């Protein structure tokens, strides 16, 4: 039996996680700091020198500026019998005035094991049948009905909520910042 350790989207909302060692791969779905924390990624890679860093195409440049070698996740990558498959291409639309970036969800699969899908920040990717589905609980780009439609569409027997930190203090600040910047100029927030 072989155990592999993967970390997906170690962003700036994961403050209780601390240092993680013995990783085989660090997977980054996109460059937003709640998924790729520029203040932590260098130390994370240093603590895991043998880990491969797979990311969406635009995050390669972000990582390069930090001195971290990342590989654009554009095709299947094997780790022994486990296959990591990129699914999707673009981040969900937040607002017409915010440029869209790349977002690559990840499908983890191995013979005889449950298939796991993490979508990053998009609900339009189609990984095929999965047994374990990570689903964004709350996001500035997502309505509640879109979240429930995502769960219904994939109909996975197991679902793991992700992206829930926006419901805490820092998330409130994020929503208020967007309301201030994008909600019009005739109000004080």
Where are these regions (language model features)?
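Core dinuclear metal-dependent hydrolase active-site scaffold
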Residues: 1-21, 72-129, 141-146
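Redox-cofactor binding/interface segments in oxidoreductases and associated redox assembly factors
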Residues: 8-9, 27-28, 85-87, 135, ...
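Active-site metal-binding motif and surrounding structural segment of the metallo-beta-lactamase
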Residues: 11-55, 131-134, 155
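Alpha-helix capping/helix-boundary segments
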Residues: 33, 59-60, 124, 166
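Portal/gating segments that form or line small-molecule/metal binding sites
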Residues: 41-42, 46-92, 177
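Short secondary-structure boundary segments
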Residues: 57, 137, 162-164
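Binuclear metal-ion centers of metallo-dependent hydrolases, dominated by the metallo-beta-lactamase
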Residues: 64-80, 148, 152, 157-189
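Short Gly/Pro-enriched loop/turn and capping motifs at secondary-structure junctions
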Residues: 123-125, 138-142, 156, 165-167
